[in-house]
From Swiss-Prot:
It comes from the Bacteria. Its main location: cytoplasm. Pfam families: CTP_transf_like (PF01467). Homohexamer. Substrate binds at T11, K43, L75, R89. Reversibly transfers an adenylyl group from ATP to 4'-phosphopantetheine, yielding dephospho-CoA (dPCoA) and pyrophosphate. One of its GO terms (biological process) is coenzyme A biosynthetic process. InterPro entries: Cyt_trans-like, PPAT, Rossmann-like_a/b/a_fold. Disulfide bonds: none annotated. This is Phosphopantetheine adenylyltransferase. One of its GO terms (molecular function) is pantetheine-phosphate adenylyltransferase activity.
Length: 163
């Protein structure tokens, strides 16, 4: 039986096969999954917010109960606007758990009704991080195993412009 709405926030710079796998599996668990692409003022993303939203929409088009939207500001404000109470996060390793555990606690302090649900990635995606994918691409490495072909093409265009 599927449950309500899950908000899956992130920078998604770039949107990886690991992100896609998590959304695919979440779409089987929840009535609706909202992929909330963050503006991310504290980071220097390769792709603009609009580009990251477009890329995620393209990758996730096969999933009818998935919506992709951008947002700026506090995640808790976004949840309130959406009348949502569930945050979906992926956990790849123990190092992810410590950070995500702290964030879940802080989010609950800001919005006591919120719950955070963690999914672990499929084994083949456990090591993929968008940060590593960006760095490998910047250094001229092949990231085609970690992202969809259209994402790889756009990533190659971006990094070649920055060289």
């Amino acid at each position: 039986m599927k449950e309500g709405v899950a908000i899956y926030p992130g920078t998604f710079d770039p949107f990886t096969r690991g992100h896609e796998d998590l959304v695919r599996r979440a779409s089987l668990l929840f009535n609706k999954v909202v992929v909330a692409v963050a503006e991310s003022h504290g980071k220097a993303p390769i792709f603009t917010l609009a580009e990251r939203v477009e890329i995620a929409r393209d990758v996730l088009a096969p999933f009818p109960n998935v919506e992709v939207t951008g947002f700026d500001g506090l995640l808790m404000d976004f949840l309130r606007q959406r009348d949502a109470r569930l945050i979906l996060r992926g956990l790849r390793a123990v190092s992810d758990f410590e950070y995500e555990f702290q964030m879940a606690g802080m989010n609950r302090k800001l919005f006591p009704d919120v719950e955070t649900v963690f999914l672990t990635p499929a084994e083949e995606y456990m090591f993929i991080s968008a940060t590593m994918v960006r760095e490998i691409a910047r250094l001229g490495g092949d990231v085609s195993k970690f992202v969809q072909p259209a994402v790889n093409e756009r990533l190659l265009q971006k990094v070649s412009l920055k060289r």
